[in-house]
Design a protein with these regions (language model features):
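Mid-to-C-terminal functional-domain signal that highlights helix-capping/loop sites
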Residues: 1-236
């Protein structure tokens, strides 16, 4: 939340772990493109309320939500998404007791448990610095689970719809919701936020189940960047 981008190497693979609080978009990308490893930083700019990144090698600008270069020498290039999960620390610790957690060099420099966006994700809130059209039939700040179900085809499910059913199956995808994760954008402290639950999206393939990339973002974000995407609405 405070730094928005972490350049790291995990399992020998250079990755960029990114988060845009204004869109609640948490995405992980491979940093290798055309044989070159890119290092990413924040431009300080927004487009449709979403973080615009840049790479230090070519100074091209990248849209965080889509992973596409929108300005510069790499215009039109796309970063490959890495499957990841936005989940509570408790769930992570239970799944990986020996898992490693990134901490700053000086943890006391900033209160990382504080939320500078108090009540930003309330259903009736207005997206910050957004000038686009809102989707119909759903509040713009409703959380949705966005997935590229097939190459170039995007769908999203209203989180309330998934929470009500607990599981949604579509094609070879299985989308699940379980309670136990605090919203980072609700209360003054991250741990004090209301429960928005944990989401997983997996694909059944050849008798195996594999995680696939997804994002739990706001409805206005999905509509802005995937205007032709299908949005499944449930009860508000």
């Amino acid at each position: 939340m405070w730094h928005e981008i972490v350049n790291d190497t995990v399992g020998g693979k250079p990755v960029a772990v990114t988060y845009c609080p204004l869109c609640n978009a948490a995405l992980v990308f491979e940093r290798t493109l055309g044989g070159q490893v890119l290092d990413f930083g924040t431009t300080g700019k927004l487009r449709n309320s979403d973080l615009v990144m840049y790479d230090r090698q070519t100074e091209s600008w990248w849209q965080q939500f889509t992973g596409e270069a929108i300005v510069g020498a790499l215009l039109g290039s796309e970063l490959k998404l890495v499957p990841s999960r936005l989940e509570s620390f408790e769930r992570f610790r239970n799944r990986f007791p020996e898992g490693r957690v990134l901490v700053p060099n000086d943890p006391g420099k900033r209160n990382y448990g504080a939320n500078p966006y108090v009540r930003y994700d309330e259903i009736g809130s207005v997206p910050f610095l957004f000038r686009g059209d809102f989707p119909e039939g759903i509040q713009p700040m409703e959380r949705v689970v966005a997935v590229e179900v097939e190459p170039g085809r995007f769908e999203a499910w209203q989180l309330g719809l998934l929470r009500e059913s607990g599981e949604i199956r579509t094609g070879d995808l299985v989308i699940r919701w379980e309670a136990g994760q605090a919203s980072a954008l609700d209360a003054a402290t991250v741990g004090g936020g209301r429960d928005v639950g944990n989401v997983t999206v997996q694909r059944r393939a050849g008798g195996r189940v594999e995680d696939v990339p997804y994002d739990v973002t706001f409805a206005f974000v999905f509509h802005a960047f995937r205007p032709n995407g299908k949005l499944h609405r449930g009860k508000l």
